[in-house]
Design a protein with these regions (language model features):
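Helical "substrate-binding/catalytic lid" subdomain
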Residues: 125, 135, 158-286
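Rossmann-fold dinucleotide-binding core
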Residues: 67-69, 88-185
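Structural motif
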Residues: 6, 29, 57, 83-85, ...
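Conserved dinucleotide-binding and phosphotransfer motif residues
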Residues: 22, 102, 248
Length: 294
């Protein structure tokens, strides 16, 4: 089949290559002319035969919205737009309505696999009607990993991005658990080779995972992570997961704590701990540490 692909960055560029390897035609557009096959969205749409499928792989928020707005003016009834970026699931219904007014279908798709997806395949979670999903199915089949799993029609519009959001929330908590265990192992004198402890966990243990494999890769590059500063950003999906939990009264202690740990990583000197130190000094005369004057 033919596919229009908008956004050819680290993920989009590799996805184009994987789909082409499966025998499909992909026409890609990107603001970077060095990687684009066409010079505009209008040219991309003009090169596709109907009914068209256009996959949007651009940053969530304004970039996705402006792309969908433009496609709504260019596409025809019966065409389908797939949002494969990390959009907030609450935006999906709005996009479906905007496109649906013009008879254009919409499918939201959460994509996991990162830079490894070209060779290993991408895990796909998508939401939309059976009719619209069927039009995209050959592309889903090309992108997914080999085997029976790694791809799911999660439900109606919004379900794909919601599932990907929860996936990323779980990822936050798993990374935090590995990080806490690593720090504790590094702290004690009795464990002399933390890297090899992590490596030993890769086979036969209940905590083996791809994230653990990546942790071992990182420790092979920098055994004690001395080259890194302990600063961790968050992409937004961890926050959205916690907000969804609050909206649905679902307790998420591990995921929430892992998000807050990232906030703490960005503070060189915690204002909260200053207040705690001051209060302990006030009520109990406990010692405090003063800032060193320069």
């Amino acid at each position: 089949m033919e596919l229009g692909l908008v956004g050819l960055g680290k993920m989009g560029g590799n996805m184009r290559e994987r789909i082409r390897r499966a025998g499909h035609t992909v026409i890609g557009y990107d603001r970077n002319p060095d990687v684009a096959d066409v010079h505009s969205l209008e040219e991309l749409v003009g090169k596709l035969k109907g009914p068209r499928v256009v996959w949007v792989m651009v940053p969530a928020g304004a970039a996705t919205q402006s792309t969908i707005d433009e496609l709504a003016e260019l596409l025809s009834p019966g065409d389908v737009v797939v949002d494969g970026g990390n959009s907030r699931w609450t935006d999906d219904e709005k996009h479906a309505v905007e496109l649906g007014i013009k008879g254009i279908g919409f499918v939201d798709c959460g994509v996991s696999g990162g830079v490894w997806g070209l060779e290993n395949g991408y895990a796909l979670m998508y939401g939309g009607t059976e009719e619209n999903v069927a039009k995209v199915q050959p592309v889903f089949d090309a992108l997914k990993p080999e085997g029976d799993f790694g791809s799911v029609h999660a439900g109606k519009v919004g379900a794909g991005h919601f599932a990907k959001m929860v996936h990323n929330g779980i990822e936050y908590a798993m990374m935090q658990a590995y990080a806490e265990g690593w720090e504790l192992l590094e702290k004690v004198d009795s464990v002399t080779d933390v890297r090899e402890v992590f490596r030993s966990w890769q086979e036969g243990t209940v905590i083996r995972s791809w994230l653990l494999d990546l942790a071992v890769n990182a420790l092979d590059d920098d055994e004690h992570l001395d080259k890194l500063r302990g600063f961790a950003a968050d992409s937004g999906e961890g926050r959205w997961t916690v907000e969804a939990a609050i909206d649905n009264a679902v307790p998420l202690p591990a995921i929430t704590a892992s998000l807050f740990a990232r906030f703490a990583s960005r503070q060189d000197d915690s204002p909260q701990m200053k207040m705690i130190a001051a209060l302990r000094n006030q009520f109990g005369g406990h010692a405090v540490e003063s800032k060193t004057e320069n």
